[in-house]
Amino acid sequence: MFRQFRPALVLILATTAITGLAYPLGMTGLAQALFPVQANGSMIEKDGKVVGSQLIGQAFTGETYFHGRPSAAGDGYNAASSSGSNLGPTSAKLIDRVKTDYEAAKAENPAAEVPADLVTASGSGLDPHVSPEAAYFQVPRVAKARGMDETALRALVDRHVEAPELGFMGEPVVNILALNMALDAAGS
């Protein structure tokens, strides 16, 4: 009877060894050799301590920092709750949240049009980027709170605008964590 099960047993053990051990270890080794920063989560360090990842947004509050997109992933961009809100365009809850966020943003900068990404969450709820327009929209508030010149702050935002991937995929974006770290490093 064992002779009948032997080929199936050998096949399942070989498949398990290949797909469960050899392939994952090989890909991990290759990633560590070719892309060590990305393979380890694209971590950002300050004074030798990890302060975040280039790939996951953080909740910045207060007038002295640029704010990211609203997060549908719970408080503080909780990666364990990553996902969209699943609220449809006719959802009263979504409409109320967007109206509240819009009114708060409009009060902050009444002369400017509120960029959509400041009032809408991303699909994952963890997006670390905003559009350059969303960053520029926040310049007057941050400049006033930090006592900075708006022109200098706009120049800082300009330096943190990232081009689309490969020059043509997507739109220009600004990483909020990197921008806020540069803001702190500027000493204002």
Curated annotation (Swiss-Prot):
Alphabetical keyword list: ATP-binding, Cell inner membrane, Cell membrane, Ion transport, Membrane, Nucleotide-binding, Potassium, Potassium transport, Transmembrane, Transmembrane helix, Transport
Regions crossing the membrane: 7-27
One of the record's GO cellular component terms: plasma membrane
Membrane topology: Single-pass membrane protein
Function description: Part of the high-affinity ATP-driven potassium transport (or Kdp) system, which catalyzes the hydrolysis of ATP coupled with the electrogenic transport of potassium into the cytoplasm. This subunit acts as a catalytic chaperone that increases the ATP-binding affinity of the ATP-hydrolyzing subunit KdpB by the formation of a transient KdpB/KdpC/ATP ternary complex.
PANTHER family: POTASSIUM-TRANSPORTING ATPASE C CHAIN, POTASSIUM-TRANSPORTING ATPASE KDPC SUBUNIT
Family that this chain belongs to: Belongs to the KdpC family.
Protein name per UniProt: Potassium-transporting ATPase KdpC subunit
Species this chain originates from: Agrobacterium fabrum (strain C58 / ATCC 33970) (Agrobacterium tumefaciens (strain C58))
Lineage start: Bacteria, Pseudomonadati, Pseudomonadota, Alphaproteobacteria, Hyphomicrobiales
